[in-house]
């Protein structure tokens, strides 16, 4: 009986250590604050952020990431442009390297927009702190925008983000449980 109890205690302790390691070094929880990603992610929802996988697999256009906006705040936004991309918007239409891109995650907000446009017209060189002579995203930089463009504070306001600002890629939403979702890339977005 004592041996069986000891085995249970050791098993539970090992499980907690594994959970701690996973939570500390692989996946961390994050609570969505604000409406900048609405309706994809809503205020108060909880997501799991993969803090290692994106470093080995890289970030792709369409990934949703959490990053350090400043010393006190982390933001969650969608990657629109990666290093080497030439990005521009013309009247709410995204062009990457000269090719028109679909943004299905904007469908809801386009239908319910308050003004003429939700994204507007801009090029990489128009962003704060960007090279005014180049529309190409430099190495180690990313262009990020919120899905709710009319309220989002994103690269249009603070410029491109540095790779070292990125905390990780959103892997899945786990709260509320009824809204569980594991992939936020454009081909898996329904709005």
From Swiss-Prot:
The active site is at residues 36, 77. CDD domains: S26_SPase_I. Its EC number is 3.4.21.89. It is an enzyme of class 3 (hydrolase). This is Signal peptidase IB. Pfam families: Peptidase_S26 (PF10502). The chain crosses the membrane at residues 8-28. Residues 29-191 are extracellular. Its main location: membrane. It comes from the Bacteria. Belongs to the peptidase S26 family. One of its GO terms (molecular function) is serine-type endopeptidase activity. Keywords: Cell membrane, Hydrolase, Membrane, Protease, Transmembrane, Transmembrane helix. It comes from Staphylococcus aureus (strain Mu50 / ATCC 700699). One of its GO terms (biological process) is signal peptide processing. It catalyses: Cleavage of hydrophobic, N-terminal signal or leader sequences from secreted and periplasmic proteins. Residues 1-7 are cytoplasmic. It is found in: Cell membrane. GO terms for cellular component: plasma membrane.
């Amino acid at each position: 009986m004592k041996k069986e109890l000891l085995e249970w205690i050791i098993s539970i302790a090992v499980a907690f250590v594994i959970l701690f390691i996973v939570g500390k070094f692989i996946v961390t929880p994050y609570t969505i604050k604000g409406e900048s990603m609405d309706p994809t992610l809503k205020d108060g929802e909880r997501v799991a952020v993969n803090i290692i996988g994106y470093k080995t697999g890289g970030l792709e256009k369409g990934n949703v990431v959490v990053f350090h906006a400043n010393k006190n705040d982390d933001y969650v936004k969608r990657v629109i442009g990666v290093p080497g991309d030439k990005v521009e918007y013309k009247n709410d239409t995204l062009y990457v390297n000269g090719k028109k891109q679909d943004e299905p995650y904007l469908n809801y907000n386009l239908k319910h927009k308050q003004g003429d446009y939700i994204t507007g017209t801009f090029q990489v060189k128009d962003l704060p702190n960007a090279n005014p002579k180049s529309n190409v995203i430099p190495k180690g930089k990313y262009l990020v925008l919120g899905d709710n463009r009319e309220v989002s504070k994103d690269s249009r306001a603070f410029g491109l983000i540095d790779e070292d600002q990125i905390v990780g890629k959103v892997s899945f939403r786990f709260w509320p449980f009824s809204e569980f979702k594991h992939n936020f890339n454009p081909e898996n977005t329904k709005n």
